[in-house]
């Protein structure tokens, strides 16, 4: 378990990976978290719910994300690299090539030291390496989704 999870602990399992709305209105910004590890998804859900008034939508599979993301209208995508059925690097390239998602901010989250992933993240300016402090993620989110 990485430093991030040890520090935060792990909250209950997310059974339904669909949309979670916590004190968020229908016009709140939508953050889509593409993460297959339920423990990490649970931590994201808990911490992002406490930290802001965003709508959260979880997708645990790369192919499902490829099919759903263009029509979700996400304001921000948090994209794990290690996904089943379609890896995050391939999904990233697909999303950047799609007219509905090409301008959506994507934060690439990885523990990998692979250069291609870092280059991909550096092109967007939005690469977050595990382990990270949750405040780092919040700072990125607040910069990309300023409150109105």
Locate predicted features.
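The feature encodes the CheY-like receiver
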Residues: 84, 102
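Acidic, metal-coordinating helix/loop segments flanking the phosphotransfer/catalytic sites
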Residues: 58-76
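Alpha4 helix (beta4-alpha4-beta5 surface) of REC/receiver domains from two-component response regulators
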Residues: 45, 90, 112-129, 135, ...
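Acidic catalytic/metal-coordinating carboxylates
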Residues: 61, 87-93
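Two-component/phosphorelay signaling modules centered on CheY-like receiver
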Residues: 38-57, 64
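Non-catalytic signal-transmission and effector/linker regions of two-component phosphorelay proteins
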Residues: 1-32, 133-148
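Active-site residues of response regulator receiver
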Residues: 80
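Conserved acidic carboxylate
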Residues: 35
């Amino acid at each position: 378990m990485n430093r991030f999870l040890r520090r935060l602990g792990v909250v209950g399992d997310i059974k339904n990976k669909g949309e979670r709305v916590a004190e968020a209105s229908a016009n709140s910004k939508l953050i889509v978290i593409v993460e297959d590890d339920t423990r990490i998804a649970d931590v994201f859900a808990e911490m992002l719910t406490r930290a802001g008034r965003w709508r959260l939508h979880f997708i645990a599979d790369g192919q499902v994300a490829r099919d759903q993301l263009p029509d979700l209208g996400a304001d921000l995508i948090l994209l794990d690299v290690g996904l089943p059925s379609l890896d995050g690097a391939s999904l990233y390239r697909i999303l950047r090539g799609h007219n509905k998602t090409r301008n959506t901010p994507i934060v690439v989250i990885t523990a990998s030291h692979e250069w291609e992933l870092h280059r991909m993240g550096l092109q967007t300016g939005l690469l977050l390496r595990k382990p990270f402090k949750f405040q780092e993620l919040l700072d990125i989110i607040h910069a990309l989704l300023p409150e109105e």
